[in-house]
């Protein structure tokens, strides 16, 4: 299922600026009393495909709202994801750089996690 999520061009932004954009998006659109751990941040090279994988394998996406920023390269995206994890967002498995993202995973995304799949 294709959703055509809007991806903001952040290729000219610094890591700090992108982290601030993501956190500000959380504060303005979400932040209904949940903790940041109720929100998932990740990186991908195909937003529609990754969101479908989350829906099928991980969790529902509340109101199908996903915010995304395209970074200059995978190193920037992975560092943004890492810093968001330090701020308290759920970033998944942290054993690998970019949590398994591939070399062209330049899109950082934010969503509110819904009910876990198979729960």
Give the role of each language-model region:
Residues 1-91, 95-119:
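GIY-YIG nuclease catalytic motif and its immediate N-terminal context
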């Amino acid at each position: 299922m294709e959703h055509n999520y809007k991806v903001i061009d952040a290729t000219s932004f610094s890591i700090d600026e992108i982290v601030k954009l993501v956190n500000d998006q959380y504060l303005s659109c979400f932040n209904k009393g949940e903790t940041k751990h109720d929100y998932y941040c990740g990186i991908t090279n195909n937003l529609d495909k990754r969101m479908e994988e989350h829906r099928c394998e991980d969790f529902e996406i509340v109101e199908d709202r996903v915010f995304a920023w395209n970074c200059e390269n995978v190193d920037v995206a992975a560092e943004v994801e890492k810093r968001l994890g330090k701020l308290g967002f759920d970033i998944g498995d942290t054993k690998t750089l970019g949590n398994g993202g591939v070399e062209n995973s330049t899109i950082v995304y934010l969503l509110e996690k819904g009910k876990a799949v198979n729960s």
